[in-house]
C-alpha cells in the first residue's frame, strides 16, 4: 500500500524549498488503469488540505492576499483569438472543430466566454472543442479573506486527466469512429493538445513570485510562509472533469484557484513519450518545482478492480464482460504506458499491490 502521509510530507517539503521561487508546485501521478492513482491523488490532496485547515484553526487571521506578483502573469497571450463569427460557427458545430478532431498538431485557441458560474473568462479550446475547454477567470474583484470560511481554503487541488477525454460526439467524427469508441481511453482519444496547454499555463503560474512584508525565519513553517504570499493577481483556472454516468466530460468541474499552491495531476499518459504527451514532463520540470510518481502494480490485481468499475458504471452488464473489456482495452493501454515511459531519472516508483 502507498503511504500517502509520507507523500504529503514530501510534497510539502518541496513547496517549502521552492516557496521563494515558485508560486505553486506540481505533482505528476501516473499509473495504469486500476492502479489506484485517482484514490491516491484524492487521499494526498485531502491530507494536505486537512493539515492546512488545522494550521488555520490554530492561527486565525493569518492569511493575506496581496497584489504583488513578479512577473505579472499573462497566461495565454500567445494564443490566436477566435473572432465572434468563428465562435458562432464552433457553437453551431456542437462546440467542435470538425476538420481537426484527430489533429494532434492543432494549436489551442482562445475566445471570450463565461464560466459555469456566469463569470467573465477566457476560454481555451483545442481539437476536443468546448467539452475539454480550460477557462481562465478575469481577475477583478479583490478577495475578502474575512468572508471566507477557513475550511473552504484549500491549498491542494487534483486535476484528473479524465476531463480531457474526447467527447463521444467528437469520436463520432473520427475517420474510424467504431474503433475510436472501442479504444476509448487510448492516447488518441484524449485532447492532449489542450492538456499540454493546461500544463503550460500552470508552469507560468508556478514561476511567479510574490513578495511579502513579513520576514521569515528558518523556524517558520511552510503554512506560515504561504499564508502570507497569496496573490490577487493569480486567476482562477477552471478545468473539466468526467461524468462516468453521462460518459462524457463535464465543464468547470475543478478550480485551480489563487489559493492553490499544490496541483496534483493524475492520469495514464502524463509520462508517455509520444506526441503532445511527451512535452508535459519538460514543461513542468523546467519550473524546478515538480515531483513525479509512477505507480507499479501487477495486471492481475488491476483486472478485477477495473472489471468491477466497468460494471458499476454501466459500461458492461456482467463481471465477465468487464474482464473482457479490460483485456481488450485497458490492459493494452497499461502495457502501452509501460512500453513508452519517458526516460528521465527522477521518476519515483511506488507499489500499490
Swiss-Prot record:
InterPro entries: P-loop_NTPase. It comes from the Eukaryota. Keywords: ATP-binding, Kinase, Nucleotide-binding, Transferase. Gene3D superfamilies: P-loop containing nucleotide triphosphate hydrolases (3.40.50.300). Its EC number is 2.7.1.-. One of its GO terms (molecular function) is ATP binding. ATP-dependent kinase that could be involved in endoplasmic reticulum membrane assembly. Belongs to the YFH7 family. This is ATP-dependent kinase YFH7. It comes from Saccharomyces cerevisiae (strain JAY291) (Baker's yeast).
